[in-house]
Amino acid sequence: MNDHHTSASISATAHRELAPQGEPAVSRDLAPTGEGCYCPAAMSESAMVRLRIAVVVAALLFAALLFASPAVAGAPVITAAGDIGHQGEPDAPQRRTARLVLSIEPTAALTLGDNQYPDGELADFMASYDPTWGRFKNITRPVPGNHDYHTAGADGYFDYFGQRAHRSNGGYYSFDLGAWHLVAVNSGPGSISNAQLDWIRDDLLRSDAMCELAYWHHPRWSSGTNHGSDQDMAALWQVLYGQGVDVVLNGHEHNYERFAPLSPSGDREPRTGIREFVVGTGGAGSYPFGDPIPGSQRRITDVFGVLRMTLQNDGYTWAFVRANGRVSDNGHHGCHG
């Protein structure tokens, strides 16, 4: 495994995913022959034309599905959520979201910070996080949040995740997944250092990936009332926008919110903007929304779940999946290229 300037990486071949399509209804309209059967020979001319068209369409759909199946199977799938380990409950919600991740069988599981409440102590990680989300620790790509830093230096977080947390590199790192380049950012202390910004800019300059994604804890944009939009993330957004990043994933607000692609000033930019998902729904109690801010497209609270993304060669599909398996938001979008 070969992380960019750190340690491990995940590599998979991503292909374009074929969107599900329903087969057209085939109208047979077969006329009785007088011998107790319904046969094509007795069709009207218009019915025969409809049948021929339907057969051709069905054959084309079958061929498309046949040749697309390997592409769908090969596209990397990620899950993402933050605000996870809710301490002290015997049947805490993170048990349900962990089972959901296991059922999805992702290529990689991204955590979006505040992995363990209330203070990110190692003992709490072992008692709460490890029996649930720790079941897929081997595919987890974590970032820390402010609650992880309630323990000095986020020691519990770094000790629990070990090399996967990249302590020696300041807790930030990057890796490739199929056609995508992903950057894990450390916003746990509440701000992004100039050294980290420089590293992120240089890392993205070296990337030749078609599609790019960055993830961290504190959202630049949010309609939530507990924290809301974080101005301290503005410089980071500017760097990511300047390097053509496609998607950002955050936690911190304990709800789900999807934004239109946005510029650094928060204006909609369908062609060059960055789409942000806030997914603070991993297990900690929910937070309410205020009035939607510009660019907000979907808001869901009082729910636990994860974001599922399929990383295609030139785009992505997304679905917010509740802990009960119900999909509450989904769509697809192309990469900037």
Language model regions located:
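Intrinsic-disorder-associated, low-complexity terminal segments enriched in Asp/Asn/His/Tyr and depleted
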Residues: 3-5, 15, 29, 38
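N-terminal amphipathic/hydrophobic targeting modules at extreme N-termini
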Residues: 17-31
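Short, positively charged and aromatic/hydrophobic N-terminal segments
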Residues: 38, 44-45
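Bacterial N-terminal signal peptides
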Residues: 54-68
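N-terminal active-site segment of His-dependent metallophosphoesterases
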Residues: 72-125, 195, 202, 222-223
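Residue-level marker for buried hydrophobic side chains located in beta-strands
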Residues: 78-80, 109-111, 142-143, 214, ...
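Active-site glycine-centered loops adjacent to acidic/histidine catalytic or metal-binding residues
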Residues: 83, 113-114, 145-146, 217, ...
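Extended active-site neighborhood of metal-dependent phosphoesterases/phosphodiesterases
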Residues: 118-212, 227-247, 255-312
